[in-house]
Amino acid sequence: MATTASPTPAQLQAVISPREQFLAAFEQEHATTMRVLRAFPADKQELQPHAKSKSARDLAWIFVLEMGLLEKALTRGFDWSQPPGGSPPAPDLATIIEKFDEGHKRVADVVANMRDDQLVETVKFFVAPKTLGDIPKIQFMWMVLCDQIHHRGQFSVYLRMADGKVPSIYGPTADEPWY
């Protein structure tokens, strides 16, 4: 089997801006998350593995909320004089998937049109329990993306519990072997 050498971080940084690096990862992770969400059996959306766990539908809604959070952080910032809140979850996974995809496209467009100097501007966000701090926008962008990856991991466990087929994420799964 042939392998190709990946460029070193220094080589990448010389040709790809931090904004472009983020967008490439953002698109790749979005495509993977969409595969996982679409694989979930619609008739099992209320699956709740534990009393303290969210239902699958509520967990999927986090992806939509985070796109709104990211768009707001990059365009307007937050008004912390009002308690944070989100809209209630959509009634079904199909709507959630559609809203997540729409939100992703809006955020990708915002990021694509940002200048690199805007990435170091800060946004007020939580840095510890009940503690706000200034976070560079680029760091906030990566934090949200990493949080989505975390929730996708949770959702993939729900998917297995719902007897769905877990698609490849970073490698083969029992349902999608690579060899």
Model segments located where?
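Short, contiguous alpha-helical
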Residues: 2-5, 9, 23-27, 31-37, ...
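Soluble or luminal CAZymes and related metallo-dependent hydrolases
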Residues: 18, 25-29, 99-103
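Active-site rim elements
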Residues: 18-23, 90-97, 141-145
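Solvent-exposed, charged/polar functional surfaces in cytosolic regulatory/catalytic domains
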Residues: 32-35, 39, 102, 106-113, ...
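Helix-adjacent hinge/juxtasegments
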Residues: 72-115
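Acidic catalytic patch
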Residues: 113-128
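Short, low-complexity N-terminal intrinsically disordered segments enriched in polar/charged residues
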Residues: 10-20
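Short, solvent-exposed, charged loop/turn and helix-capping segments
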Residues: 40-43, 116-117
